[in-house]
């Protein structure tokens, strides 16, 4: 695809390192250690779309692959990251072109939805994205919980990865409809990622048997727990565990923790924006204990194949959908919906567990 004298294309994997200079320019706050990790271990697995002018990369968009649970099924989806445009090429529609190209390919693969963590939601709303997950946050002062009942803590090593993967899957599937599959490969990479951010993955345990985990970074000597998962019923022993592990820290910031640990100072903020990619595949992937019937029309400028009027039914066994013929539209008068509205209606925020660690 070409725009003026610029070309839009997906890079061959051997070319991915060509985007590093733009990455370092657009994301100057990322440490050298993290950028090294990203290009050594992550970028090779990504799909990278770029706008080129001759040999110069003007803009880029990365698709990070994840296996994602959705109502009992597992789907290969993509997390949109590292969207950036060189300063002199901004406000020329390059990001829209990259989104359109990447969404088209995801549509061809029948991916139900995609997601991203926006720097500014206003950038993505015009393209069918809407907030569909949130994250809680509170500050913990470790010394206030010294002497409280506490889970054991120990630094996760590669030998702990199989147990972590099994425990995380067991805990998350009981509560959430949507979450990234916690495989051994997922945790192996997470160990490296946290090391690149001067942090760790910490196992929460009872008599050395894993009962959960926490993920934290400590860049600039500021501790931030980015995700905390623990077996139901053991939440009250988490604060004591934090007091032991972070004994010398005056305070720590905690994100993405169980609701039972929320207090009057807890803040909840929108986190991830999602977008339906293949509308029919999305509806067919859903399940609902209470049957849901829908009759609606959608206009999708980015993926015109989704545009139309539909009738859908979602049951405990899955979803069924069909596109209405013109004569049916006049009779049934389908409700006009935005893509983001439909996504939010069918996947409530509390059913989704997608954090920065994904």
What kind of region is each of these model predictions?
Residues 128-147, 226-236, 240-358:
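Active-site/acyl-donor-binding loops of N-acyltransferases
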Residues 106-118, 247-258:
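Conserved GNAT acetyl-CoA-binding A-motif
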Residues 89-101, 233-242:
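Conserved acetyl-CoA pyrophosphate-binding loop and the N-cap/start of the following alpha-helix
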Residues 134-241, 245, 257-261, 274, ...:
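Amide-forming acyltransferase catalytic core, primarily the GNAT-like/NAT-type
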Residues 1-65, 72-79, 145-184, 219-223:
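Short amphipathic alpha-helix that is part of the acyltransferase structural core
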Residues 75-87, 222-232:
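Conserved acetyl-CoA binding element of GNAT-fold acetyltransferases
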């Amino acid at each position: 695809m070409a725009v003026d004298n610029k070309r839009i294309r997906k890079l061959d994997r051997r070319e991915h390192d060509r985007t590093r200079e733009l990455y370092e320019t657009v994301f100057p706050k990322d440490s050298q250690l993290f950028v090294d990790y990203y290009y050594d271990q992550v970028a090779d697995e990504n799909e990278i779309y770029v706008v080129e002018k001759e040999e110069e990369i003007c803009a880029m968009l990365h698709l990070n692959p994840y296996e994602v649970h959705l109502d009992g099924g597992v789907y290969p989806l993509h997390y949109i990251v590292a969207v950036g445009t060189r300063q002199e090429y901004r406000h020329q529609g390059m990001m829209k072109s990259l989104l359109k190209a990447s969404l088209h390919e995801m549509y061809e693969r029948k991916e139900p939805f995609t997601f991203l963590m926006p720097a500014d939601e206003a950038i993505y709303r015009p393209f069918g994205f809407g907030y569909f997950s949130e994250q809680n946050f509170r500050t913990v002062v470790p010394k206030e919980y010294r002497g409280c009942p506490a889970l054991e803590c120990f630094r996760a090593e590669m030998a702990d990865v199989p147990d972590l993967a099994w425990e995380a899957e067991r805990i998350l599937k009981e509560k959430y409809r949507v979450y990234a599959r916690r495989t051994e490969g997922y945790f192996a990479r997470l160990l490296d990622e946290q090391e690149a951010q001067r942090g760790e993955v910490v196992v929460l345990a009872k008599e050395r048997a894993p009962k959960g985990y926490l993920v934290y970074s400590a860049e600039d000597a500021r501790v931030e727990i980015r995700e905390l998962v623990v077996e139901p019923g053991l939440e009250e022993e988490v604060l004591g565990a934090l007091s032991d592990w972070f004994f010398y820290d005056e305070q720590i910031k905690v994100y993405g923790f169980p609701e039972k640990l929320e207090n009057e100072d807890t803040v909840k903020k929108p986190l991830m924006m999602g977008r339906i990619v293949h509308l029919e595949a999305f509806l067919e992937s859903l399940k609902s204990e209470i049957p849901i019937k829908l009759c609606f029309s959608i206009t999708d400028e980015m993926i015109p194949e989704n545009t139309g009027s539909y009738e859908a039914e979602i049951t405990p066994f899955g979803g069924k959908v069909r596109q209405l013929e013109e004569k049916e539209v006049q009779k049934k008068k389908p409700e006009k919906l935005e893509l983001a509205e439909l996504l939010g209606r069918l996947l409530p925020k509390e059913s989704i567990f997608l954090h920065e660690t994904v």
